[in-house]
């Protein structure tokens, strides 16, 4: 008592005894109250010595205050006494307990206000990274952003990757910044172009909204007054630093442009965070054993990513935080009341539910409880094993001793299998007759997934999946077999709460394997009880202990000890669960099967099994029995009608057999899959790492379950010799080898499994391709290998094993056909075979090896070898090696003798590419960062066009290398090319649309390539002009080619087995052969012009090769094109000469010939109508469908869709403004206007205006964010417009609108001085282009052309309706000399005075007065001058 009484002495003790317990009460505090308080504090595990000082009292009050709302009256009295004692220590004059409590609230409130004010002041002083400061002259100047702040921002973006943390990080770093500083921060993260584009859209939309709500004042500004900021001024694009400072700091109505801009950025960041972190706040729930602190961290991290107002976020915090907590924490949080702060919640829920908290409370209870209760605890613990129902003994799988299980074993963990003792596998994989012990239930010996036939749990690869049990387990249990046929399974996805009957009372209980005792609340049990105190959630509780209480759960009864007391949750502990025979089961391979279906309308394969030899049958039987034991396949009965044939081949060693299944028929019928990994990783793209490990996943496919509904389609049959017994039928439970879906499903499953490990171990670089894993890191070797073991354990938990024999720890590492060393890599050793006789299959394998070696060995060539196997040949056909192929093969052998190595990628250095031409149209290239240290090499021999030249092939090589670089390293290299800038630009000026190439700088490296001849761009003065032409008959293959000159010279030759194209080229060859050193050649063939004008230097066509040889002999050649049938003298003359006796024309039946003729000559509609006897509207439609007769500026090679209702739309920029341009592809008609922002809303509004003026069915745009926005999709859906996008790397797909952009800008520059605003100049330029500039076929303007095209389309549509209608009629007619009616004939055309009919293959023209037209209603009789039906001709 002396220690307790020493809390107060002297005057303080006198003051203590003067304070009343309650206002107006006669009772006062005495010394005994201090003694009582000291003992109570010991009960709550608090130090009584803290009562001696005011600071100690404050600590006690802070510790006890959270429990007041749920505490007992005794706790409230203790807290009141400590409050009074605190006032006495501080010498506050109080009269009773109520005044003491009031005094405490006042003091604590004033402290909080002072602390908050202090924090606010310090935050204002230290929070602004870029304050606007006043200089010595009193002017407000800007303090520039510091590199340290900028570096912190860049590092945050790279590490957080737009997670919710990036928003408070941005707000902290940009505190006090103006728009200029914020734009500097955004420019520093320019590598994230996709995210910045989203941010740009938000800024544009907010700027437009600002301009709408803050219109500029009308009229000029007063002198000396600075304008009000617009939306673009706030964004910093059209304002200066001084203006931003003035708007922020001006005394009258300041506008904090920096803060406004920060709000816009935060809106954009919220949008990006939502994209990068798509988890909803509703999905954040606390796990059963998750600490409350971790749950709160996840909750607020996701809350920051929610795009909601602050009021909504406050509501989420008040409701969802409590609602989604686990039941243990939720019970405590609800007891705190609705006004609890986050601090109070975290203090109250600290350690709740975790095993650490329970262990600490239990230890304190055992240390402080009275001695007579210790026996009670001992009795509780000794209750295990005393249950009369429990049979058998517990045996440890680790040490082999009885009395405990392996989890509680104190002996060292035994390596290897717990059953047979061998290393290399675990007990679950042991094949010595028993299954994994975790899958055996204590009460029946059945596997966990075989307990109940109604379970829907997916079958693991190690489970047989059938319903047959082993005979061993059946005989071992005896009578209990009937009780365990179908035991209940309780999953742990949610809290395991069941209904139990305890002492005859029904109640909801929680099955808690972490609790020793069974504790219930609000239940009256019969019999004697004894008092007991146990440690629980929130402290100690007093309970009543009943013995031998009957507990019934799921139909099974057990008697045991039950405690009754004020527990928040009814708990069934291990003392009852053990008696019930309840066990925890861990299923292997929890991978969810991927749903798979057959193609619509198809059924499974039903292919008969072909005969097999006896040794193959025996081998397949043994293999399938082993697979069945491992659960990979299951036996099936005759109810499955499907079958796939199987066979067996010997492995490479020649001793073991391998089972193969012919899944070709099933693959045809299975749905299509998307390959989630389109290529293999390349070692040149790996970064050099200090530690490297290579792993291989064993039985990769057989570790992934197959969709249970699809398994029946994988059925196969093992036949018997001489059909002695029915065949044994099986189906697959796992992914089969050879099935088309196995690679995609395995890759997808493997990626999902590795994702959490990648997130938890960012230091590791994991490259995954199928079952091969490369793991590299810069960690020390010991730490790296620890991480590897964690990875192997992680994979093992999901059912994937990593065999030790394929676990490579030391270099060199064999991976994906490569050999990896610490500082270099190469391909694995390649041996080229020496053969006297080569087959097609041998050549194919040889070319594959050489192509594989070419990625690191320079100069590998295979062109001559590829020539050997051209055409359709059998794989076993013998191929003699040509002299060139033998020489090429020997050169490759010599190159492969010298070892060559590549190096690893260094991100901080630039990529360079060297390209060389090897001769024979073969190219090689090397990609490197340092000279003579190649990352990758390669070759190029493919020829996309039949006629090409070195410049065009070089462009194709650049394109190939660029795409490889983007795939492997994610960026473009710099090129060193064997060409001069002048040679390149000479060809590229006209052929810029032939292919895509990236931006690159010219570094010419010898030997240089060049153009061997050049076509002149203007006619050659004084040179003779040759008009050339050719014609061929498609049926007879006969043709003519020739030329005429303006001097009267002409030459015509006859051709056999030719085509129109060959005849046209032969005519040009004749002109070149017969002309002098300089010549002008005129052709009407677009095909011939396209071939020759691309200046090829080699060609697969013999005629083109001869033309190239003739061109190299000439000094100057001018080649041009004119349209056919335009009355051009020389062209018309040669056309008649070569067409004589060649062409044949039929009316209407000759539409195909007319289209072919137009593709060749591009004649106008009048010429087509005259030559082929077509109606004008039909001839005009042929013209309208030809892109070359309407489009100006299109690429020389390639065409675009020129249907009458197709438009191309694009955005271009001029004078800092955005111009949106729409071009009618078929006519070149333009619609354009200036838009305020390049957003989806503005683009969609422009599209709707366009659709309101013209018929628009299809639009073609690029992949810009404004065109791919949801607003644009909605506009296209509403207007029923099909939206097509451009092809990446192919600007020709947007060639029409790109050319029109250039022309429109040219016209704008011509009329710009006539307009004050750009938008006015744009409309003036559109008017000039559409109605003041003529050109093209017929000399139309674009406006006239679009009207003519649309009118012709309407006429053609009506004409087609008439033609289809006319085909429904039959005609009876008579000749002038024969009065007998003939027919019926088919009606082809009905004119004003005559009809065209077809009778028995002959086409005739009959006057209307001698023809009777009737509808075909079946067999009808025709009378003289009368119709067989009442239908008139007008119908």
Swiss-Prot record:
Region (Interaction with membrane phosphatidylinositol 4,5-bisphosphate and RNA): 14-33
Domain (Integrase catalytic): residue spans on this chain: 1200-1350
Zinc finger (CCHC-type): 394-411, 415-432
Region (Interaction with Gp41): 7-31
Marked site positions, Cis/trans isomerization of proline peptide bond: 219-220
This protein's name: Gag-Pol polyprotein
Domain Reverse transcriptase: 630-820
Marked site positions, Cleavage: 130-131, 362-363, 380-381, 434-435, 442-443, 486-487, 585-586, 1025-1026, 1146-1147
Start and end residues of each stretch annotated as Dimerization/Multimerization of capsid protein p24: 276-362
GO cellular component, one term: host multivesicular body
Residue sites binding Mg(2+) 3 per the record: 1210, 1262, 1298
Reactions catalysed, as given in the entry: Specific for a P1 residue that is hydrophobic, and P1' variable, but often Pro; Endohydrolysis of RNA in RNA/DNA hybrids. Three different cleavage modes: 1. sequence-specific internal cleavage of RNA. Human immunodeficiency virus type 1 and Moloney murine leukemia virus enzymes prefer to cleave the RNA strand one nucleotide away from the RNA-DNA junction. 2. RNA 5'-end directed cleavage 13-19 nucleotides from the RNA end. 3. DNA 3'-end directed cleavage 15-20 nucleotides away from the primer terminus; 3'-end directed exonucleolytic cleavage of viral RNA-DNA hybrid; DNA(n) + a 2'-deoxyribonucleoside 5'-triphosphate = DNA(n+1) + diphosphate
PROSITE patterns: ASP_PROT_RETROV, ASP_PROTEASE, INTEGRASE, INTEGRASE_DBD, RNASE_H_1, RT_POL, ZF_CCHC, ZF_INTEGRASE
Sequence segments annotated as region (Interaction with membrane phosphatidylinositol 4,5-bisphosphate): 73-77
ZnF (Integrase-type) ranges: 1149-1190
Gene Ontology molecular function terms on file: aspartic-type endopeptidase activity; DNA binding; DNA-directed DNA polymerase activity; exoribonuclease H activity; lipid binding; RNA stem-loop binding; RNA-directed DNA polymerase activity; RNA-DNA hybrid ribonuclease activity
DNA-binding region positions on the chain: 1369-1416
Location of the region described as RT 'primer grip' in the Swiss-Prot/TrEMBL record: 813-821
Segments forming domain Peptidase A2: 507-576
Modified residues (Phosphotyrosine): 130
Keyword Cytoplasm assigned: no
Organism: Human immunodeficiency virus type 1 group O (isolate ANT70)
Residue span of region Interaction with human PPIA/CYPA and NUP153: 187-225
InterPro entries per the UniProt record, alphabetical: Aspartic_peptidase_AS, DNA/RNA_pol_sf, Gag_p24_C, Integrase-like_N, Integrase_C_dom_sf_retrovir, Integrase_C_retrovir, Integrase_cat-core, Integrase_Zn-bd_dom_N
Region (Dimerization of protease): 488-492, 536-542, 575-587
Bias kind Gly residues: ranges: 463-472
């Amino acid at each position: 008592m002396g220690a307790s009484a020493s809390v107060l002495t002297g005057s303080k003790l006198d003051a203590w005894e003067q304070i009343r317990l309650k206002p107006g009460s006669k009772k006062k505090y005495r010394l005994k109250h201090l003694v009582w308080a000291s003992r109570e504090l010991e009960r709550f595990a608090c130090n009584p010595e803290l009562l001696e000082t005011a600071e100690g009292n404050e600590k006690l009050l802070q510790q006890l205050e959270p429990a007041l709302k749920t505490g007992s009256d005794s706790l409230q009295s203790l807290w009141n006494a400590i409050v009074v004692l605190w006032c006495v220590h501080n010498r506050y004059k109080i009269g009773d307990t109520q005044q003491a409590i009031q005094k405490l609230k006042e003091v604590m409130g004033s402290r909080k206000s002072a602390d908050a004010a202090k924090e606010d002041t310090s935050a204002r002083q230290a929070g602004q990274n870029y304050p606007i400061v006043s200089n010595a002259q009193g002017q407000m100047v800007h303090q520039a952003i510091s590199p340290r702040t900028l570096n912190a921002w860049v590092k945050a973006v790279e590490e957080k990757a737009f997670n919710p943390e990036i928003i408070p990080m941005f707000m902290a770093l940009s505190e006090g910044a103006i728009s200029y500083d914020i734009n500097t921060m955004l420019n520093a993260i320019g590598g994230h172009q996709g995210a910045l584009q989203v941010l740009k859209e938000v800024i544009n939309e907010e700027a437009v909204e600002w301009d709408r709500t803050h219109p500029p004042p009308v009229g000029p500004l007063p002198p000396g007054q600075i304008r009000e900021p617009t939306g673009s001024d706030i964004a910093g694009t059209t304002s200066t630093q001084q203006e931003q400072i003035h708007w922020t700091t001006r005394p009258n109505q300041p506008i904090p442009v920096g803060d406004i801009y920060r709000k816009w950025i935060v809106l954009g960041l919220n949008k990006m965070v939502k994209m990068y972190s798509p988890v909803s706040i509703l999905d954040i729930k606390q796990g059963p054993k998750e600490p409350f602190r971790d749950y709160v961290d996840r909750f607020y991290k996701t809350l920051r990513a929610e795009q909601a107002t602050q009021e909504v976020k406050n509501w989420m915090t008040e409701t969802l935080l409590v609602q989604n907590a686990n039941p243990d924490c939720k019970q405590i949080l609800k007891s705190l009341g609705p006004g609890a702060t986050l601090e109070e919640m975290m203090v109250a829920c600290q350690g709740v539910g975790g095993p650490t908290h329970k262990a600490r409370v239990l230890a304190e209870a055992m240390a402080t409880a009275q001695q007579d209760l210790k026996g009670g605890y001992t009795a509780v613990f000794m209750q295990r094993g005393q249950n009369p129902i429990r049979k058998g003994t517990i045996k440890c799988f680790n040490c082999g001793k009885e009395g405990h299980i392996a989890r509680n074993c104190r002996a060292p963990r035994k390596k290897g299998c717990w059953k047979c003792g061998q290393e290399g596998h675990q007990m679950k994989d042991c094949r010595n007759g028993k299954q994994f012990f975790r899958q055996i239930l204590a009460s029946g010996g059945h596997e966990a997934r075989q307990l109940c036939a109604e379970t829907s749990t997916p079958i693991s690869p190690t489970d047989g999946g059938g319903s047959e049990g082993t005979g061993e387990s059946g005989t071992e249990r005896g009578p209990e077999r009937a009780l365990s046929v179908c035991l209940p399974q309780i999953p742990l996805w949610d809290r395991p709460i069941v209904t139990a009957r305890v002492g005859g009372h029904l109640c909801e209980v929680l099955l808690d394997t972490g609790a020793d005792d069974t504790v219930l609340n609000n239940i009256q049990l019969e019999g004697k009880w004894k008092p007991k105190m146990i440690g629980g959630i929130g402290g100690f509780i007093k309970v009543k202990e009943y013995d031998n209480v009957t507990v019934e759960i799921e139909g099974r009864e057990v008697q045991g000890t039950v405690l009754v007391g004020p527990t928040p949750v009814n708990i069934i502990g291990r003392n009852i669960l053990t008696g019930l025979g309840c066990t925890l089961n861990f299923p292997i391979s929890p991978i969810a099967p991927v749903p798979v279906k057959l193609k619509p309308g198809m059924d499974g394969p039903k292919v008969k099994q072909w005969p097999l030899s006896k040794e193959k049958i025996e081998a397949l039987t043994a293999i399938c029995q082993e697979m069945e034991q491992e659960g990979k396949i299951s036996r099936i009965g005759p109810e499955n009608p499907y079958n796939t044939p199987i066979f067996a081949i010997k492995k490479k060693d020649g001793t073991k057999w391998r089972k193969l299944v012919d899944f070709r028929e099933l693959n045809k019928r299975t749905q299509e899959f998307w390959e989630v990994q389109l290529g293999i990783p390349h070692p040149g793209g790996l970064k050099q790492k200090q530690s490297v490990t290579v792993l291989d996943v064993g039985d990769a496919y057989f570790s992934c379950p197959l969709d249970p509904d699809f398994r029946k389609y994988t059925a196969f049959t093992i036949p018997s010799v001489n059909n002695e017994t029915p065949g044994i039928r099986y189906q697959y439970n796992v992914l089969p080898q050879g099935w088309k879906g196995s690679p995609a499903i395995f890759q997808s499953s493997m990626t999902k499994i590795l994702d959490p490990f990648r997130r938890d171990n960012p230091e590791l670089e994991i490259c995954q391709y199928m079952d091969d894993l490369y793991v590299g890191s810069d960690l020390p070797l010991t730490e790296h290998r620890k991480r590897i073991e964690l990875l192997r354990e992680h994979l093992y938990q999901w059912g994937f094993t990593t065999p030790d024999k394929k676990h490579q720890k030391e270099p060199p590492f064999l991976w994906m056909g490569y050999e990896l060393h610490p500082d270099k890599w190469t391909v694995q050793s390649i041996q080229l075979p020496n053969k006297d006789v080569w087959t097609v299959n041998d050549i194919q394998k040889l070319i594959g090896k050489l192509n594989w070696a070419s990625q690191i060995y320079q100069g590998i060539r295979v062109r001559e070898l590829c020539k050997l196997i051209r055409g359709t040949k059998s794989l076993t056909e013998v191929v003699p090696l040509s002299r060139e192929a033998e020489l090429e093969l020997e050169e490759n052998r010599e190159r492969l003798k010298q070892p060559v190595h590549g190096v690893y990628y260094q991100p901080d250095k630039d990529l360079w590419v060297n390209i060389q031409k090897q001769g024979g149209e073969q190219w090689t290239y090397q990609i490197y960062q340092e000279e003579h240290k190649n990352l990758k090499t390669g070759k190029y021999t493919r020829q996309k066009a039949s006629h090409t030249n070195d410049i065009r092939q070089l462009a194709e090589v650049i394109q190939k290398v660029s795409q490889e670089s983007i795939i492997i390293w994610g960026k473009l290299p710099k090129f060193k090319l064997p060409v001069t800038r002048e040679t390149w630009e000479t060809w590229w000026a006209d052929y810029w649309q032939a292919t895509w190439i990236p931006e690159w700088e010219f570094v010419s490296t010898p030997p240089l390539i060049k153009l061997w001849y050049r076509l002149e761009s203007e006619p050659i003065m004084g040179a003779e002009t040759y008009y050339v032409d050719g014609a061929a008959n498609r049926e007879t293959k006969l043709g003519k080619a020739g030329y005429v000159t303006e001097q009267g010279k002409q030459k015509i030759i006859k051709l056999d087995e030719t085509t129109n194209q060959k005849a046209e080229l032969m005519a040009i060859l004749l002109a070149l052969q017969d002309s002098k050193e300089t010549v002008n050649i005129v052709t009407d063939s677009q095909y011939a012009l396209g071939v020759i004008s691309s200046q090829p230097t080699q060609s697969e066509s013999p005629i083109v090769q001869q033309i190239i040889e003739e061109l190299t002999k000439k000094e100057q050649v001018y080649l041009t094109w004119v349209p056919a049938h335009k009355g051009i003298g020389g062209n018309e003359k040669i056309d008649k000469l070569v067409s004589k006796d060649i062409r044949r024309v039929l009316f209407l039946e000759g539409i195909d010939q007319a289209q072919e003729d137009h593709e060749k000559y591009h004649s106008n509609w009048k010429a087509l109508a005259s030559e082929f006897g077509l109606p004008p509207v039909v001839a005009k439609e042929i013209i309208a469908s030809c892109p070359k007769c309407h489009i100006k500026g299109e690429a020389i090679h390639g065409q675009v869709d020129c249907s009458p209702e197709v438009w191309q739309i694009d955005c271009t920029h001029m004078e800092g403004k955005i111009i949106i341009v729409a071009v009618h592809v078929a006519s070149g008609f333009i619609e354009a206007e200036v838009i305020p922002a390049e957003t989806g809303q503005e683009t969609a509004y422009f599209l709707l205006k366009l659709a309101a003026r013209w018929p628009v069915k299809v639009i073609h745009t690029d992949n810009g964010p404004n065109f791919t926005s949801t607003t644009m999709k909605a506009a296209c859906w509403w207007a029923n417009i099909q939206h097509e996008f451009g092809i990446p790397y192919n600007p020709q797909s947007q060639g029409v609108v790109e050319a029109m952009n250039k022309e429109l800008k040219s016209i704008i520059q011509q009329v710009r001085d006539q307009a004050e605003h750009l938008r006015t100049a744009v409309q003036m330029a559109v008017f000039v282009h559409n109605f003041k500039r003529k050109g093209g076929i017929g000399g139309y303007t674009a406006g006239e052309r679009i009207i003519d095209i649309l009118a012709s389309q309407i006429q053609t549509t009506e004409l087609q309706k008439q033609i289809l209608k006319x085909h429904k009629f039959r005609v009876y007619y008579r000749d002038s000399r024969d009065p007998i009616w003939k027919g019926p004939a088919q009606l082809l055309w009905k004119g004003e005075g005559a009809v065209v009919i077809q009778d028995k293959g002959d086409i005739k023209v009959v006057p209307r007065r001698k023809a009777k037209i009737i509808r075909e209603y079946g067999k009808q009789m025709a009378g003289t001058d009368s119709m067989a039906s009442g239908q008139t001709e007008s119908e």
